[in-house]
Amino acid sequence: MPIQVLPPQLANQIAAGEVVERPASVVKELVENSLDAGATRVDIDIERGGAKLIRIRDNGCGIKKEELALALARHATSKIASLDDLEAIISLGFRGEALASISSVSRLTLTSRTAEQAEAWQAYAEGRDMDVTVKPAAHPVGTTLEVLDLFYNTPARRKFMRTEKTEFNHIDEIIRRIALARFDVTLNLSHNGKLVRQYRAVAKDGQKERRLGAICGTPFLEQALAIEWQHGDLTLRGWVADPNHTTTALTEIQYCYVNGRMMRDRLINHAIRQACEDKLGADQQPAFVLYLEIDPHQVDVNVHPAKHEVRFHQSRLVHDFIYQGVLSVLQQQTETTLPLEDIAPAPRHVPENRIAAGRNHFAVPAEPTAAREPATPRYSGGASGGNGGRQSAGGWPHAQPGYQKQQGEVYRALLQTPTTSPAPEAVAPALDGHSQSFGRVLTIVCGDCALLEHAGTIQLLSLPVAERWLRQAQLTPGQSPVCAQPLLIPLRLKVSADEKAALQKAQSLLGELGIEFQSDAQHVTIRAVPLPLRQQNLQILIPELIGYLAQQTTFATVNIAQWIARNVQSEHPQWSMAQAISLLADVERLCPQLVKAPPGGLLQPVDLHSAMNALKHE
């Protein structure tokens, strides 16, 4: 058979195979066109589940007479005009294929009128070449599309249509999703001449919740937790049901929208599931209605024929943003249920941990008190039995968020005890009203050292060494194991018999460090790592860690944490002032003992006296 150009109707029918799956697909495409036209009211009339009639009427801007024929042509659209528009799509439709595809498998009639026109015009396509006929009609401002006898000329497609009830249920679900996306639009759905759904337009938040209850049901509304989460160009809002009270019926409510477009995105669902997994059973699913707003340049919606999926340019950032947003709401819900007697009273003044950046001249001074308790963090230091091989002698004292009042006198006495450090000149003295600090960052030297000033002395601090100690503190478990962060894509590695035996022997300790894995005959699958390792190249780091464990005869969490801290790659090949200040603030908060007794290689005093004497003798 020679190569030939397909007739327009056949080409459109082929395209319809991707766009028009069932009557619900037609309703989705046509209602989205109405929304793009600025409609505030859309009436959907269905007969026999959409097989006989689908009528969509709106009060949008309408289509001009001279554009009606183009509206039924392939690749004709008013949504985009250039590649730049395609890379930043803000409309629901943009391909210009829907009307042409639908008209090729049905008897479609398009009637429209703009506000500038005195009369409406009607267009329909027919014949092998899909010739468009335009004639006058009576119609208010807006557009009406009638789709009769869907799949009448493609018997194979019509044979696969389900029962009238099933097809209408799919249409009903599409309208529910659209109603959740656009609270400002009135949607009326009728079936066989009977009004089935009526979603009135609302504007205020209280009215939005009533419409949410009408769509998703009262049980969901009663358990819904509101979300408002923002970071840069990312915004997450909506509702998620309390996982502690999620029932089987609620798990069917899973609606997510990206820039107002309904989505079934696996990345979004995984982030939400991960945030709720601690409170959900193995057979439970989270219930949510969430809206993600993102810069259109950072998302590609042209990756699925029906536009059900998107591709994010920074998928890890979006995943973690959604995860943190949902998790923060669930944590706030948990905190609000705590009994009041278990909550310690708030302090009168909380000193800022900002010595590295300099004193805040705009801070409100604390009220004078007779004796202020020092703001020294509490940390555990003694050995405890039954810790599964964890060593505390010579280990890392893990910082805690604060200390109880009954321990205040003990720590006050400890702070008054004279120090016996062999190198007192390397210890930074405490500052009034603040916890001990390395001092103020003056500048960055050679890209990886910070020049510090404190109490009239100048010191050089190695930023990579400080970062390594901070990583070790973050990786060393305290009273509870390090929080594990599940991987979006688990890492599967082949291991030898010795490596597998070492992993099984150290599995409990690795679990305390936030590293979770499963092993089979010759492979190990890493499923979770601690937060400091999320941005590392795990395909290199994890095999090296397994090799290190295979060479050890005994295991301790401190030694494993030290090895990981020394072998992770720094995120800052060249340090900036802001990064150095942030690092020192974290080190002072999590590793206060480094300020009291800096280890070798961290701090080096700069002798100003010899330099000043040399200048004076010039």
UniProtKB/Swiss-Prot annotation:
Region feature (Disordered): 367-402
Task: Give the record's GO CC terms.
Answer: mismatch repair complex
| Ranges annotated as biased composition (Low complexity) | 367-381
Keyword annotations from UniProtKB, A to Z? DNA damage, DNA repair
Listed Gly residues bias regions: 382-392
* Molecular functions per Gene Ontology: ATP binding; ATP hydrolysis activity; ATP-dependent DNA damage sensor activity; mismatched DNA binding
- Read off the Gene3D superfamilies from this record: 3.30.230.10, Histidine kinase-like ATPase, C-terminal domain, MutL, C-terminal domain, dimerisation subdomain, MutL, C-terminal domain, regulatory subdomain
Against InterPro entries, the record matches this protein to: DNA_mismatch_repair_CS (IPR014762), DNA_mismatch_repair_MutL (IPR020667), DNA_mismatch_S5_2-like (IPR013507), HATPase_C_sf (IPR036890), MutL/Mlh/PMS (IPR002099), MutL/Mlh/Pms-like (IPR038973), MutL_C (IPR014790), MutL_C_dimsub (IPR042120)
Ranges in coiled-coil conformation: none
**UniProt family annotation:** Belongs to the DNA mismatch repair MutL/HexB family.
Name recorded for this polypeptide: DNA mismatch repair protein MutL
Protein's organism: Salmonella paratyphi B (strain ATCC BAA-1250 / SPB7)
